[in-house]
Amino acid sequence: DQTLNEIRAGANGDAADNVPEEKEKMQASSAKLDDTPLTKKYARPELATLVEFPPSGSEWLHEIKYDGYRIMAFLEDGKVRLRTRGGKDWPHKFPGITDQLATINVSNAVLDGEIGVLNDRGATSFSALQDALSRQDPSQVEGWFFDLLHLRDDDLTKTPLLERKIALKKILSHKTLTLVHYSDHLESSPHLLKKACGIGAEGLVSKRKD
């Protein structure tokens, strides 16, 4: 069977959308930096709604749901800011991810994704992520990014999702990005949810392609 690591499909970070309260409060002492035009415009990520079964049909795509921490990456003039769903700025907590994002050759971009740690089964584990943070050892922490909200001078939120993902895949395609990954998606198919859970995923996040 394929592991989550092998299929390299990051979830819509909506993996953190319905997390217990203690996840939201983890490391809550982190300082918040001054806002920029981009952090003000894209202040909070879009959250998912929990349903029992994923929708089907060619107009939908599906992403593996990670057991990690939702993050938004702001790339502005060579500087990188990683902001949690709760508004905490964490670039210093994940220097490897921050440094690799800084090598991306774009002047301005906003990426939406998930940060997590893979366990021995190749599935993300929130407890492993929490352990890495408590030990102040972020070497095993990786980032999976599934959406591109802004690129250069353009707000892409009204652009069809598939087009945004194509652009995101392009800017994350460099081989040196070993800790930063493009989060791919799956097409609708029978038993898709069962297959996702079979490889250790928490579930699926489904989105309309348009």
Where would I find each of the regions flagged by the language model?
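Catalytic cores of nucleic-acid ligases and guanylyltransferases
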Residues: 1-210
